Protein backbone atom coordinates (compact mmCIF):
# COMPACT_ATOMS: atom_id res chain seq x y z
CA UNK A 1 0.00 0.00 0.00
CA UNK A 2 1.10 3.56 -0.65
CA UNK A 3 1.56 5.99 2.22
CA UNK A 4 -1.58 7.86 1.08
CA UNK A 5 -3.56 4.61 1.26
CA UNK A 6 -2.25 3.87 4.76
CA UNK A 7 -3.06 7.38 5.97
CA UNK A 8 -6.53 7.25 4.43
CA UNK A 9 -7.23 3.96 6.14
CA UNK A 10 -6.20 5.44 9.49
CA UNK A 11 -8.12 8.66 8.85
CA UNK A 12 -11.38 6.83 8.18
CA UNK A 13 -11.24 5.39 11.70
CA UNK A 14 -10.94 8.86 13.24
CA UNK A 15 -12.52 11.39 10.87
CA UNK A 16 -15.93 10.94 9.17
CA UNK A 17 -15.13 9.66 5.70
CA UNK A 18 -11.45 10.21 6.41
CA UNK A 19 -11.63 13.88 5.44
CA UNK A 20 -12.62 17.26 6.85
CA UNK A 21 -14.51 18.33 3.72
CA UNK A 22 -16.40 15.76 1.63
CA UNK A 23 -15.05 16.43 -1.88
CA UNK A 24 -11.52 15.62 -0.70
CA UNK A 25 -12.51 11.96 -0.26
CA UNK A 26 -12.54 11.36 -4.05
CA UNK A 27 -16.12 10.09 -3.83
CA UNK A 28 -16.82 11.88 -7.12
CA UNK A 29 -14.10 9.97 -8.97
CA UNK A 30 -13.37 6.91 -6.85
CA UNK A 31 -10.04 5.75 -5.49
CA UNK A 32 -7.84 6.97 -2.67
CA UNK A 33 -7.33 10.70 -2.11
CA UNK A 34 -3.83 12.07 -2.22
CA UNK A 35 -2.33 13.07 1.10
CA UNK A 36 -0.18 16.15 0.53
CA UNK A 37 3.22 16.69 2.11
CA UNK A 38 3.95 20.18 0.80
CA UNK A 39 3.24 22.61 -2.01
CA UNK A 40 5.24 25.26 -3.83
CA UNK A 41 4.35 27.46 -6.77
CA UNK A 42 2.13 25.53 -9.18
CA UNK A 43 3.02 22.14 -7.70
CA UNK A 44 1.73 19.77 -5.04
CA UNK A 45 3.92 17.02 -3.57
CA UNK A 46 2.22 14.01 -2.02
CA UNK A 47 3.44 11.89 0.88
CA UNK A 48 4.68 9.26 -1.57
CA UNK A 49 7.04 11.75 -3.19
CA UNK A 50 5.17 12.41 -6.44
CA UNK A 51 4.79 15.92 -7.86
CA UNK A 52 1.66 17.24 -9.57
CA UNK A 53 0.80 20.34 -11.57
CA UNK A 54 -2.02 21.67 -9.41
CA UNK A 55 -5.25 23.07 -10.85
CA UNK A 56 -7.19 22.90 -7.58
CA UNK A 57 -5.22 25.60 -5.77
CA UNK A 58 -6.76 24.71 -2.39
CA UNK A 59 -10.14 25.20 -4.12
CA UNK A 60 -9.36 28.75 -5.20
CA UNK A 61 -7.28 30.74 -2.70
CA UNK A 62 -3.88 30.08 -4.28
CA UNK A 63 -4.13 32.59 -7.11
CA UNK A 64 -0.45 33.49 -6.57
CA UNK A 65 0.61 29.86 -6.29
CA UNK A 66 1.53 27.92 -3.18
CA UNK A 67 3.95 29.16 -0.53
CA UNK A 68 4.25 32.66 -1.94
CA UNK A 69 7.10 34.43 -0.10
CA UNK A 70 5.19 37.67 0.53
CA UNK A 71 2.36 35.81 2.25
CA UNK A 72 4.64 33.41 4.10
CA UNK A 73 6.77 36.26 5.45
CA UNK A 74 3.71 38.27 6.49
CA UNK A 75 2.37 35.29 8.45
CA UNK A 76 5.71 34.70 10.19
CA UNK A 77 6.05 38.37 11.12
CA UNK A 78 2.48 38.56 12.45
CA UNK A 79 2.82 35.32 14.43
CA UNK A 80 5.81 36.73 16.28
CA UNK A 81 3.51 39.41 17.75
CA UNK A 82 0.84 36.96 18.93
CA UNK A 83 -1.77 34.66 17.43
CA UNK A 84 -5.09 36.14 18.55
CA UNK A 85 -6.14 39.04 20.74
CA UNK A 86 -9.94 39.18 20.70
CA UNK A 87 -9.62 42.94 20.29
CA UNK A 88 -9.36 45.37 17.36
CA UNK A 89 -6.05 45.70 15.52
CA UNK A 90 -4.57 48.17 13.05
CA UNK A 91 -4.33 45.42 10.43
CA UNK A 92 -8.13 45.02 10.46
CA UNK A 93 -8.47 48.68 9.53
CA UNK A 94 -5.82 48.43 6.82
CA UNK A 95 -7.47 45.30 5.44
CA UNK A 96 -10.90 46.96 5.37
CA UNK A 97 -9.43 50.00 3.62
CA UNK A 98 -7.79 47.81 0.98
CA UNK A 99 -10.87 45.66 0.33
CA UNK A 100 -13.18 48.65 -0.03
CA UNK A 101 -10.69 50.33 -2.37
CA UNK A 102 -10.42 47.24 -4.57
CA UNK A 103 -14.18 46.53 -4.61
CA UNK A 104 -15.87 49.94 -4.98
CA UNK A 105 -19.42 48.62 -4.35
CA UNK A 106 -18.39 47.78 -0.77
CA UNK A 107 -18.77 50.92 1.35
CA UNK A 108 -18.15 48.87 4.49
CA UNK A 109 -16.92 45.34 5.17
CA UNK A 110 -17.18 42.87 8.07
CA UNK A 111 -14.55 40.11 8.39
CA UNK A 112 -15.54 36.53 9.25
CA UNK A 113 -13.81 33.15 9.15
CA UNK A 114 -15.22 31.40 6.07
CA UNK A 115 -17.30 31.80 2.96
CA UNK A 116 -20.18 30.02 4.68
CA UNK A 117 -20.13 32.60 7.48
CA UNK A 118 -20.08 35.37 4.90
CA UNK A 119 -23.12 34.15 2.96
CA UNK A 120 -25.04 33.14 6.09
CA UNK A 121 -24.46 36.56 7.65
CA UNK A 122 -25.26 38.46 4.46
CA UNK A 123 -28.59 36.66 4.12
CA UNK A 124 -29.47 37.36 7.77
CA UNK A 125 -28.59 41.01 7.19
CA UNK A 126 -30.73 41.17 4.04
CA UNK A 127 -33.67 39.66 5.92
CA UNK A 128 -33.23 42.04 8.83
CA UNK A 129 -32.85 45.09 6.60
CA UNK A 130 -35.88 44.32 4.41
CA UNK A 131 -38.09 42.72 7.05
CA UNK A 132 -38.75 39.84 4.66
CA UNK A 133 -38.07 36.10 5.06
CA UNK A 134 -37.82 34.43 1.66
CA UNK A 135 -34.65 34.25 -0.43
CA UNK A 136 -33.89 33.16 -3.99
CA UNK A 137 -30.94 30.94 -4.84
CA UNK A 138 -30.14 28.99 -8.00
CA UNK A 139 -30.06 25.31 -8.82
CA UNK A 140 -26.46 24.11 -9.00
CA UNK A 141 -25.04 27.09 -7.11
CA UNK A 142 -23.40 26.55 -3.72
CA UNK A 143 -23.07 29.19 -1.03
CA UNK A 144 -21.81 27.16 1.92
CA UNK A 145 -23.52 24.78 4.31
CA UNK A 146 -25.90 27.08 6.20
CA UNK A 147 -29.31 25.45 6.70
CA UNK A 148 -31.20 27.90 4.50
CA UNK A 149 -28.82 27.21 1.60
CA UNK A 150 -28.84 23.39 1.67
CA UNK A 151 -32.09 23.45 -0.26
CA UNK A 152 -33.11 22.02 -3.63
CA UNK A 153 -36.01 22.91 -5.89
CA UNK A 154 -39.38 21.34 -5.25
CA UNK A 155 -41.16 19.20 -7.81
CA UNK A 156 -42.68 22.22 -9.55
CA UNK A 157 -41.07 25.39 -10.79
CA UNK A 158 -42.58 27.51 -8.03
CA UNK A 159 -42.86 25.03 -5.18
CA UNK A 160 -41.17 25.86 -1.93
CA UNK A 161 -37.67 24.51 -1.40
CA UNK A 162 -36.96 21.09 0.04
CA UNK A 163 -33.93 20.23 2.23
CA UNK A 164 -31.16 18.37 0.40
CA UNK A 165 -29.45 17.29 3.61
CA UNK A 166 -30.81 15.50 6.66
CA UNK A 167 -30.78 17.83 9.64
CA UNK A 168 -32.27 20.78 7.77
CA UNK A 169 -35.84 21.34 9.01
CA UNK A 170 -38.49 21.75 6.33
CA UNK A 171 -39.59 24.93 8.11
CA UNK A 172 -36.19 26.45 7.27
CA UNK A 173 -36.22 25.29 3.67
CA UNK A 174 -39.68 26.67 2.95
CA UNK A 175 -38.28 30.20 2.90
CA UNK A 176 -35.76 29.36 0.15
CA UNK A 177 -36.91 29.53 -3.48
CA UNK A 178 -34.68 27.76 -6.00
CA UNK A 179 -34.66 29.15 -9.54
CA UNK A 180 -32.82 28.13 -12.71
CA UNK A 181 -29.40 29.70 -13.30
CA UNK A 182 -29.29 31.87 -16.44
CA UNK A 183 -33.12 31.86 -16.63
CA UNK A 184 -34.61 35.25 -15.76
CA UNK A 185 -38.15 34.05 -16.44
CA UNK A 186 -37.96 31.66 -13.49
CA UNK A 187 -36.81 34.50 -11.23
CA UNK A 188 -39.57 36.85 -12.35
CA UNK A 189 -42.12 34.09 -11.74
CA UNK A 190 -40.86 33.71 -8.16
CA UNK A 191 -41.09 37.44 -7.52
CA UNK A 192 -44.57 37.61 -9.00
CA UNK A 193 -45.75 34.79 -6.75
CA UNK A 194 -44.19 36.36 -3.62
CA UNK A 195 -43.91 40.09 -4.49
CA UNK A 196 -43.65 41.37 -0.89
CA UNK A 197 -41.88 38.41 0.74
CA UNK A 198 -38.47 38.04 -0.94
CA UNK A 199 -35.58 39.64 0.95
CA UNK A 200 -32.78 38.91 -1.49
CA UNK A 201 -31.31 37.00 -4.38
CA UNK A 202 -27.98 35.31 -3.73
CA UNK A 203 -26.04 34.24 -6.81
CA UNK A 204 -22.61 33.05 -7.89
CA UNK A 205 -21.76 35.46 -10.73
CA UNK A 206 -19.88 32.57 -12.33
CA UNK A 207 -21.31 29.30 -11.07
CA UNK A 208 -18.28 27.42 -9.75
CA UNK A 209 -19.94 24.52 -7.98
CA UNK A 210 -21.51 22.93 -11.02
CA UNK A 211 -18.05 23.07 -12.57
CA UNK A 212 -17.66 26.46 -14.29
CA UNK A 213 -20.76 28.05 -15.84
CA UNK A 214 -20.54 31.75 -16.75
CA UNK A 215 -23.64 33.96 -16.82
CA UNK A 216 -25.40 34.76 -20.07
CA UNK A 217 -25.00 38.47 -20.95
CA UNK A 218 -28.47 39.47 -19.78
CA UNK A 219 -28.57 37.38 -16.59
CA UNK A 220 -26.83 39.46 -13.91
CA UNK A 221 -28.19 42.83 -15.13
CA UNK A 222 -31.62 41.20 -15.22
CA UNK A 223 -31.30 40.11 -11.59
CA UNK A 224 -30.33 43.66 -10.62
CA UNK A 225 -33.40 45.02 -12.40
CA UNK A 226 -35.75 42.50 -10.76
CA UNK A 227 -34.38 43.29 -7.29
CA UNK A 228 -34.93 46.99 -7.91
CA UNK A 229 -38.45 46.35 -9.20
CA UNK A 230 -39.53 44.24 -6.22
CA UNK A 231 -37.53 45.91 -3.42
CA UNK A 232 -35.14 43.00 -2.75
CA UNK A 233 -31.38 43.08 -2.21
CA UNK A 234 -28.92 41.52 -4.66
CA UNK A 235 -26.15 39.52 -2.96
CA UNK A 236 -23.29 38.48 -5.23
CA UNK A 237 -21.32 35.57 -3.82
CA UNK A 238 -17.74 36.27 -4.95
CA UNK A 239 -16.13 33.71 -2.64
CA UNK A 240 -14.71 31.99 -5.74
CA UNK A 241 -14.65 34.82 -8.26
CA UNK A 242 -13.51 37.70 -6.07
CA UNK A 243 -10.04 39.02 -7.06
CA UNK A 244 -9.79 36.12 -9.55
CA UNK A 245 -12.11 36.86 -12.48
CA UNK A 246 -11.04 40.51 -12.23
CA UNK A 247 -9.42 42.62 -9.52
CA UNK A 248 -12.81 44.04 -8.48
CA UNK A 249 -14.45 40.67 -9.02
CA UNK A 250 -16.96 39.26 -11.47
CA UNK A 251 -19.32 42.12 -10.63
CA UNK A 252 -16.86 44.50 -12.27
CA UNK A 253 -16.13 42.10 -15.14
CA UNK A 254 -19.84 41.84 -15.95
CA UNK A 255 -20.80 45.39 -14.97
CA UNK A 256 -23.39 44.74 -12.26
CA UNK A 257 -23.72 46.55 -8.91
CA UNK A 258 -24.81 44.39 -5.95
CA UNK A 259 -26.17 45.58 -2.64
CA UNK A 260 -23.98 43.10 -0.75
CA UNK A 261 -20.90 41.10 -1.73
CA UNK A 262 -19.53 37.95 -0.10
CA UNK A 263 -15.81 37.20 -0.25
CA UNK A 264 -13.57 34.30 0.76
CA UNK A 265 -10.68 32.15 -0.44
CA UNK A 266 -8.26 34.67 -2.03
CA UNK A 267 -9.04 37.30 0.60
CA UNK A 268 -7.28 35.08 3.15
CA UNK A 269 -4.26 34.14 1.06
CA UNK A 270 -4.63 30.54 2.24
CA UNK A 271 -5.80 31.31 5.77
CA UNK A 272 -9.45 30.85 6.88
CA UNK A 273 -11.01 34.22 6.06
CA UNK A 274 -14.36 35.35 4.70
CA UNK A 275 -15.96 38.77 4.44
CA UNK A 276 -19.20 40.44 3.48
CA UNK A 277 -19.94 44.05 2.78
CA UNK A 278 -21.75 46.55 0.62
CA UNK A 279 -24.03 49.55 0.90
CA UNK A 280 -23.42 51.66 3.99
CA UNK A 281 -27.10 51.90 4.92
CA UNK A 282 -27.42 48.11 4.81
CA UNK A 283 -24.19 47.44 6.70
CA UNK A 284 -25.18 49.95 9.40
CA UNK A 285 -27.97 47.52 10.33
CA UNK A 286 -25.32 45.13 11.74
CA UNK A 287 -24.57 44.98 15.46
CA UNK A 288 -23.28 46.90 17.31
CA UNK A 289 -24.67 49.88 15.35
CA UNK A 290 -27.84 48.06 14.28
CA UNK A 291 -30.16 45.26 15.39
CA UNK A 292 -28.91 42.41 13.15
CA UNK A 293 -26.56 40.25 15.20
CA UNK A 294 -23.32 38.74 13.91
CA UNK A 295 -20.13 37.93 15.81
CA UNK A 296 -17.05 35.71 15.81
CA UNK A 297 -14.28 34.96 18.31
CA UNK A 298 -11.60 34.71 15.63
CA UNK A 299 -13.04 37.18 13.10
CA UNK A 300 -10.31 39.58 12.00
CA UNK A 301 -7.63 37.24 13.37
CA UNK A 302 -4.28 39.05 13.09
CA UNK A 303 -2.48 36.18 11.33
CA UNK A 304 -5.27 35.77 8.79
CA UNK A 305 -5.47 39.53 8.21
CA UNK A 306 -1.73 39.72 7.60
CA UNK A 307 -1.92 36.88 5.07
CA UNK A 308 -4.89 38.41 3.29
CA UNK A 309 -3.38 41.88 3.20
CA UNK A 310 -0.16 40.56 1.68
CA UNK A 311 -2.08 38.46 -0.84
CA UNK A 312 -4.35 41.27 -2.01
CA UNK A 313 -1.44 43.66 -2.41
CA UNK A 314 0.25 41.14 -4.71
CA UNK A 315 -2.96 40.39 -6.62
CA UNK A 316 -3.44 44.13 -7.22
CA UNK A 317 -0.12 44.42 -9.08
CA UNK A 318 -0.29 45.22 -12.81
CA UNK A 319 -0.46 42.24 -15.15
CA UNK A 320 -1.72 39.63 -12.68
CA UNK A 321 -5.16 39.19 -14.21
CA UNK A 322 -3.88 39.46 -17.76
CA UNK A 323 -1.50 36.59 -16.97
CA UNK A 324 -4.27 34.50 -15.43
CA UNK A 325 -6.46 35.03 -18.48
CA UNK A 326 -3.65 34.25 -20.92
CA UNK A 327 -2.72 31.01 -19.17
CA UNK A 328 -6.31 29.85 -18.74
CA UNK A 329 -7.20 30.66 -22.35
CA UNK A 330 -4.17 28.72 -23.61
CA UNK A 331 -5.13 25.72 -21.47
CA UNK A 332 -8.75 25.79 -22.63
CA UNK A 333 -7.84 26.11 -26.30
CA UNK A 334 -5.20 23.39 -26.03
CA UNK A 335 -7.56 20.94 -24.35
CA UNK A 336 -10.21 21.55 -27.01
CA UNK A 337 -7.67 21.02 -29.81
CA UNK A 338 -6.38 17.80 -28.24
CA UNK A 339 -9.90 16.48 -27.70
CA UNK A 340 -10.91 17.26 -31.28
CA UNK A 341 -7.86 15.41 -32.60
CA UNK A 342 -8.99 12.33 -30.65
CA UNK A 343 -12.65 12.67 -31.59
CA UNK A 344 -13.65 13.35 -27.98
CA UNK A 345 -16.66 15.69 -27.57
CA UNK A 346 -15.63 18.39 -25.11
CA UNK A 347 -16.69 21.82 -23.88
CA UNK A 348 -14.29 23.98 -21.85
CA UNK A 349 -15.74 27.06 -20.16
CA UNK A 350 -13.36 29.64 -18.75
CA UNK A 351 -13.47 33.12 -17.22
CA UNK A 352 -10.35 34.80 -15.91
CA UNK A 353 -8.50 32.25 -13.78
CA UNK A 354 -11.39 29.73 -13.61
CA UNK A 355 -12.18 26.91 -16.01
CA UNK A 356 -14.44 23.89 -16.36
CA UNK A 357 -14.10 20.69 -18.42
CA UNK A 358 -17.29 19.01 -19.67
CA UNK A 359 -17.51 15.78 -21.65
CA UNK A 360 -20.62 16.48 -23.70
CA UNK A 361 -21.95 16.51 -27.25
CA UNK A 362 -23.68 19.83 -26.55
CA UNK A 363 -22.33 22.99 -28.13
CA UNK A 364 -22.43 24.88 -24.83
CA UNK A 365 -23.01 24.39 -21.10
CA UNK A 366 -25.03 27.22 -19.57
CA UNK A 367 -27.18 25.75 -16.78
CA UNK A 368 -27.53 22.95 -14.24
CA UNK A 369 -29.45 20.72 -16.65
CA UNK A 370 -26.63 21.00 -19.20
CA UNK A 371 -24.08 20.04 -16.55
CA UNK A 372 -26.09 17.03 -15.40
CA UNK A 373 -26.29 15.76 -18.99
CA UNK A 374 -22.48 15.50 -19.26
CA UNK A 375 -20.58 12.20 -19.21
CA UNK A 376 -19.47 11.88 -15.59
CA UNK A 377 -18.05 8.38 -16.05
CA UNK A 378 -15.73 9.60 -18.79
CA UNK A 379 -14.61 12.45 -16.52
CA UNK A 380 -13.74 9.95 -13.79
CA UNK A 381 -11.48 8.03 -16.16
CA UNK A 382 -9.97 11.27 -17.45
CA UNK A 383 -9.25 12.45 -13.90
CA UNK A 384 -7.36 9.31 -12.89
CA UNK A 385 -5.41 9.09 -16.14
CA UNK A 386 -4.38 12.74 -15.79
CA UNK A 387 -3.40 12.08 -12.18
CA UNK A 388 -1.13 9.29 -13.43
CA UNK A 389 0.38 11.88 -15.79
CA UNK A 390 1.15 14.17 -12.85
CA UNK A 391 -1.75 16.60 -13.31
CA UNK A 392 -4.06 17.25 -10.35
CA UNK A 393 -7.54 18.39 -11.39
CA UNK A 394 -10.57 18.84 -9.15
CA UNK A 395 -11.70 15.31 -8.11
CA UNK A 396 -15.28 15.93 -9.22
CA UNK A 397 -17.02 16.61 -12.52
CA UNK A 398 -18.93 19.37 -10.72
CA UNK A 399 -16.06 21.53 -9.44
CA UNK A 400 -14.23 24.33 -11.24
CA UNK A 401 -10.51 24.35 -11.93
CA UNK A 402 -8.25 27.21 -10.86
CA UNK A 403 -5.21 28.78 -12.47
CA UNK A 404 -2.44 30.67 -10.67
CA UNK A 405 0.18 33.13 -11.84
CA UNK A 406 2.77 30.62 -10.62
CA UNK A 407 1.87 28.32 -13.52
CA UNK A 408 4.25 28.69 -16.43
CA UNK A 409 3.44 28.31 -20.10
CA UNK A 410 5.58 25.17 -19.94
CA UNK A 411 3.25 23.80 -17.23
CA UNK A 412 0.27 24.54 -19.46
CA UNK A 413 1.82 22.92 -22.52
CA UNK A 414 2.83 19.87 -20.47
CA UNK A 415 -0.76 19.61 -19.25
CA UNK A 416 -2.09 19.78 -22.81
CA UNK A 417 0.42 17.13 -23.93
CA UNK A 418 -0.69 14.89 -21.04
CA UNK A 419 -4.33 15.39 -22.02
CA UNK A 420 -3.50 14.50 -25.63
CA UNK A 421 -2.02 11.18 -24.47
CA UNK A 422 -5.02 10.55 -22.23
CA UNK A 423 -7.59 11.43 -24.90
CA UNK A 424 -5.95 8.92 -27.24
CA UNK A 425 -6.70 6.16 -24.71
CA UNK A 426 -10.03 7.50 -23.41
From Swiss-Prot:
A molecular function (GO) term: transaminase activity
Matching CDD domains: OAT_like
The protein's annotated pathway: Porphyrin-containing compound metabolism; protoporphyrin-IX biosynthesis; 5-aminolevulinate from L-glutamyl-tRNA(Glu): step 2/2
GO cellular component, one term: cytoplasm
Subcellular location: Cytoplasm
EC class: isomerase
Any Gene Ontology biological process: protoporphyrinogen IX biosynthetic process
InterPro entries found in the cross-reference section: 4pyrrol_synth_GluAld_NH2Trfase, Aminotrans_3, Aminotrans_3_PPA_site, PyrdxlP-dep_Trfase, PyrdxlP-dep_Trfase_major, PyrdxlP-dep_Trfase_small
EC id: 5.4.3.8
N6-(pyridoxal phosphate)lysine carried by residues: 265
Essential cofactor(s): pyridoxal 5'-phosphate
Catalytic activity: (S)-4-amino-5-oxopentanoate = 5-aminolevulinate
Highest rank taxon of the organism: Bacteria
Family: Belongs to the class-III pyridoxal-phosphate-dependent aminotransferase family. HemL subfamily.
Subunit structure and binding partners: Homodimer.
Protein name in UniProt: Glutamate-1-semialdehyde 2,1-aminomutase
Gene name of this polypeptide: hemL
Amino acid sequence: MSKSENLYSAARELIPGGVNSPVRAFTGVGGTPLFIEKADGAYLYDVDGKAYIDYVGSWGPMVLGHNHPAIRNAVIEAAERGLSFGAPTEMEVKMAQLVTELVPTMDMVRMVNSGTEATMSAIRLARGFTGRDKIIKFEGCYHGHADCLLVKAGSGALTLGQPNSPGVPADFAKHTLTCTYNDLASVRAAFEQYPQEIACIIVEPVAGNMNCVPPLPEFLPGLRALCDEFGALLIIDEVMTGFRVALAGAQDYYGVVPDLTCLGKIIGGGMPVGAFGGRRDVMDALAPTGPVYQAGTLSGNPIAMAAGFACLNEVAQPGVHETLDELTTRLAEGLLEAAEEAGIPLVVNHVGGMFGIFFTDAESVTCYQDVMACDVERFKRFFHMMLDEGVYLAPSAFEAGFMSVAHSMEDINNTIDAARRVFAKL
